[in-house]
């Protein structure tokens, strides 16, 4: 459903008080100046039609608004990434909300929302690039209950039905705020690996059931109480250039808890850093399991201690 991926549908969610940050539509530099005046700073300027946290700019001062807007136009050109071709030159400016980031995975069938679980995420301070995700969430039940309650309100306000959804939001001092919803399953190995390997139940199977009209209400598994914590972690480059290799990559698979290593670059591939490109800096993805988030973080620290991304 394009209804949910179109960020303007937040207007529907805005009818539920406190559910999402204030925002304004931006099509020109003047629109941006007006939005900054109305909403204030800091704020987030981003394209309407994108995925994977692409094209996100944090606005903290009025001094470089024109430069930032021109950079946004250039870096979100459909020539750079076809994801921008669906809603070309359509942007929103929204209030920046401080807090930890989460996503919620589930399906909606016959207007009833079924939640598979909550994913704890981390993003880079600049450009909000997602580089790590843990499933299921470590948060206390009270927090998870609030996130789920607001997720259901958001989904129902959009009136989407008979599809999977992937909702993103942040936990602020004044509660959970919804940032965006896509009427599709999550990427980043969440749907394909993390949920299944953590819980022992296939989430994809239920997504297919919804798509073909099989009722999921009586057979909805418990995805959140498996005996393992799962994680995907992205190794990133920190400079532009030509990719040479990841020194130490061969040893990663020998570490207990590492399930898979997926290289994303071959020798000689160009690496372009944000904001010129938002996904080129990702060099490899690692899927890990452990007894806890802390357990997996220790494994990641071990990996980071001996690998080196070599860029020429």
Model regions and ranges:
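Short, small-residue-biased leader/transition segments that mark boundaries at the very start
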Residues: 1-8
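ATP-grasp fold ATP-binding core
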Residues: 13, 39-59, 78-99, 104, ...
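Conserved ATP-binding module of the ATP-grasp superfamily
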Residues: 20, 62-98, 127-133, 152-157
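Short beta-strand-to-turn element immediately C-terminal to the catalytic PLP-Schiff-base lysine
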Residues: 26, 56-61, 107-109, 172
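Beta-strand scaffold of nucleotide-dependent catalytic cores
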Residues: 57, 67-70, 92-95, 101-122, ...
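Short, well-ordered beta-strand elements within core beta-sheets of diverse protein domains
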Residues: 57, 95, 196, 282-290
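Active-site "cap" helix and flanking loop/linker of ATP-utilizing ligase/carboxylase catalytic domains
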Residues: 146-167, 182-244
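Peripheral (often C-terminal) accessory segments that flank ATP-dependent C-N-forming ligase machineries
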Residues: 208-312
């Amino acid at each position: 459903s394009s209804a949910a991926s179109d960020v303007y549908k937040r207007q529907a969610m805005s009818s539920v008080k406190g559910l999402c940050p204030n925002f304004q539509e931006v099509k020109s530099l003047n629109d941006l100046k007006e939005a900054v005046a109305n909403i204030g700073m800091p704020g987030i300027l981003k394209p309407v039609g994108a995925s994977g946290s692409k094209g996100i700019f944090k606005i903290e001062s009025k001094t470089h608004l024109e430069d930032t807007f021109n950079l946004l136009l250039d870096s979100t050109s459909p020539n750079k990434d076809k994801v921008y071709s669906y809603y070309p030159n359509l942007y929103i400016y929204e209030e920046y909300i401080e807090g930890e980031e989460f996503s919620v995975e589930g399906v909606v069938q016959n207007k009833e929302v079924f939640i598979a679980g909550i994913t704890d995420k981390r993003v880079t301070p600049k450009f909000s690039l997602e580089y790590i995700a843990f499933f299921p969430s470590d948060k206390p039940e009270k927090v998870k209950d609030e996130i789920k309650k607001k997720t259901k309100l958001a989904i129902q306000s959009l009136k989407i039905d008979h599809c999977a959804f992937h909702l993103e939001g942040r936990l602020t001092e004044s509660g959970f705020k919804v940032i965006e919803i896509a009427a599709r399953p999550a990427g980043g190995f969440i749907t394909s690996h993390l949920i299944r390997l953590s819980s022992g139940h296939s989430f994809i199977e239920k997504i297919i059931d919804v798509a073909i009209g099989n009722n999921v209400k009586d057979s909805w598994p418990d995805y959140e109480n498996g005996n393992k914590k799962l994680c995907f972690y992205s190794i990133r480059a920190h400079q532009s250039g030509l990719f040479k290799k990841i020194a130490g990559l061969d040893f990663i698979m020998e570490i207990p808890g590492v399930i898979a290593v997926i290289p994303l670059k071959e020798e000689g591939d160009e690496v372009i850093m944000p904001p010129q490109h938002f996904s080129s800096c990702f060099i490899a993805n690692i899927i890990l399991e452990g007894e806890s988030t802390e357990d997996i973080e220790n494994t990641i620290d071990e990996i980071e201690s001996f690998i080196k991304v070599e860029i020429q």
